[in-house]
């Protein structure tokens, strides 16, 4: 949470999103609205492109829903909405899908970027492939045969 807050603080202090370009952490910034169809993506860094396999031009202007799929936990997404509205921040894990529709477990922290009046201008999401962190390589979800 502290890293995400530090990045958001740099943006609030007037830094351009470009200060995040060379960051090794995967970062996505969306609009500040939470209403449907959801906040549109306004910035991603190279680490996020590598994580999800989508190039920046395909991500910008769409919503994070493009990374969700059949087995994405809808209850966790509902918790995300509730916590952002109630507390203005969120930490959790969820199953996402890369461009090839391969599953990966995403650990993410979402914090606000506020304007001078204190209103939420954007949401900054710091994202980690949880299985990669554990195994040291690109994590894949392995489902047991039934």
Functional labels for PLM-detected ranges:
Residues 1-38, 120-146:
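PAS-family sensory modules
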Residues 48-59:
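PAS/PAS-like sensory domain cap-loop motif
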């Amino acid at each position: 949470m502290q890293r995400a807050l530090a990045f958001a603080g740099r943006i609030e202090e007037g830094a351009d999103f470009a200060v995040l370009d060379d960051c090794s952490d995967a970062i996505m910034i969306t609009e500040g609205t939470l209403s449907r169809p959801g906040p549109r993506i306004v910035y991603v860094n190279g680490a996020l492109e590598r994580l999800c396999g989508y190039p920046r031009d395909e991500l910008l202007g769409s919503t994070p829903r493009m990374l969700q799929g059949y087995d994405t936990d809808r209850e966790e997404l509902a918790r995300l909405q509730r916590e952002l509205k109630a507390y203005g921040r969120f930490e959790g894990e969820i199953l996402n899908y890369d461009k090839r529709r391969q599953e990966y477990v995403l650990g993410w922290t979402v914090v606000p970027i506020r304007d001078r009046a204190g209103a939420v201008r954007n949401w900054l999401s710091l994202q980690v492939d949880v299985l990669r962190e554990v195994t040291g390589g690109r994590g894949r979800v392995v489902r047991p045969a039934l």
